[in-house]
């Protein structure tokens, strides 16, 4: 039996398939900052419907999502506890300190 491994710990581990590359090359695109990208607009509409929210925002990376989350939930001097293998500890550098004024404390997970 062939083992299939799916790596989800970081968006840097994924590679697009030939079909994905074809879809990207053929996609109708526009200026997302001006609300003119039909793919992003469709994604935002789907997200609003799925989660029952009145609006949505497109964030292009997991790092951006994590940093915004910490800025919203932490005050300067707060400490964020995370598993010692967490992306915010191992890969994102001092983003929490720079943007949220918070420190990351890695702990042993289970």
Q: Residue locations for each model-derived region?
A:
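Conserved N-terminal alpha-helix of the aminotransferase class I/II PLP-enzyme fold
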Residues: 16-62, 84-90, 95
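Conserved PLP-anchoring active-site segment centered on the Schiff-base-forming lysine
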Residues: 72-90
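PLP-dependent aminotransferase-class I/II
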Residues: 100-110
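Pyridoxal 5′-phosphate
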Residues: 1, 8
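Glycine-rich loop at the start of a catalytic domain that most often binds anionic cofactors/ligands
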Residues: 50, 68-77, 95
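Binding-interface segments
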Residues: 65
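Structural motif
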Residues: 6, 55-57, 78-80, 103-105
């Amino acid at each position: 039996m062939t083992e299939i491994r799916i790596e989800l710990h970081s968006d840097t581990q994924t590679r697009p398939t030939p079909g994905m590359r074809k879809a990207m090359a053929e996609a109708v695109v526009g200026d997302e900052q001006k609300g003119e990208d039909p793919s992003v607009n469709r994604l935002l509409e789907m997200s609003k419907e799925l989660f029952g929210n009145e609006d949505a925002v497109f964030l292009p990376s997991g790092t951006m999502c994590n940093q915004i989350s910490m800025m919203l939930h932490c005050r300067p001097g707060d400490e964020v506890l995370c598993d010692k293998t967490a992306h915010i500890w191992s890969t994102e550098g001092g983003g929490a300190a720079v943007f949220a004024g918070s420190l990351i404390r890695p702990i042993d997970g289970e």
